[in-house]
Amino acid sequence: MQAQIATTRAAKPTKTCLVVEDNIFDQERIKRIMDKSFQGVFVAMASTLEDARAHMARYQTSMILLDNNLPDGNGANFAVELAEKPEFAGIPIIIVSDWPTPFMFDKAQSAGVIHVVNKSDFGARYIHAALNHKVKRPRLN
């Protein structure tokens, strides 16, 4: 019993990936990619920006996979919002969108988003990049 307690205490803390996506099919696809390649990462789902804000107020988040077109707002604007808050500015964000636009790329870059990826091109390599991302995102002026 004591050995089990010691092992539990010494275990590496679990990372949490917040997936902000309103499409159930895309949620399941991302969850399958995460479960297959990243067993040590807990996946939390949010269907709206309001749900994402509530999650982040309560739980530590290691990375965010963010759709751009959500029922209650724009993912790129949410990335800017997070970049303006010191407690969230260092969280790596990947925008995963059906229709990435030049405007979205510009806004994402200004917020320090590490990748903007078309949903059809999204895969584990982008998650690896986010989990290994060490550089603090730039602050907006």
Briefly describe each language-model feature range.
Residues 21:
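Conserved acidic carboxylate
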Residues 24-49:
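Two-component/phosphorelay signaling modules centered on CheY-like receiver
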Residues 45-63:
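Acidic, metal-coordinating helix/loop segments flanking the phosphotransfer/catalytic sites
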Residues 60-62, 87-92:
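His-Asp phosphorelay/catalytic-motif detector in bacterial-type signaling
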Residues 65-82:
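Conserved phosphotransfer microenvironments
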Residues 75, 107-115:
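As written
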Residues 103, 120-131:
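C-terminal output helix
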